[in-house]
Amino acid sequence: VSVEAELGRLAGEEDGLSVDERDARMTDPAIVAAFLARTRVDALAVTVGNVHGAYASRDPDLDWARLDAVRAAAGDVPLVLHGASGLSQRVISRAISAGVCKFNVNTELRAAARAAYAEGGDVLAAAERATSAMAGVVEAKLLAFDAGS
């Protein structure tokens, strides 16, 4: 069994957050090593300006210095980025270079499935379309992640 923990609190959106509130939600590099030693988790999900859900029109303003500091404090523990749906190739590549090994893209997968089901028709045919659409998202993401490494 692999255990992943998120250190920090990932918001559902960024709008309406002041800098102080936003910083308070982010992973604190100063406590990463102690947290990992205490919990012995297999992977660490970080909060560096990423949010759950889709980004409206542009990449999020990720705190790259914070991510680099977390990477240094985490040692060989793999880093995870929740809220990675819709990130550009530039951001994916930069995150990989900073040690992110796993990206959660649930919003993109659900959007693909929803679009397939919205076409209507037989439920089994819709399920097959949804599965195919999600497989297409997975394939595109694997190619993007591979290109970023």
PLM segments and residue spans:
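Glycine-rich beta-to-alpha transition loops that act as phosphate-gripper elements at the mouths
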Residues: 78-87
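Alpha/beta enzyme core
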Residues: 1-75, 89, 93-98, 105, ...
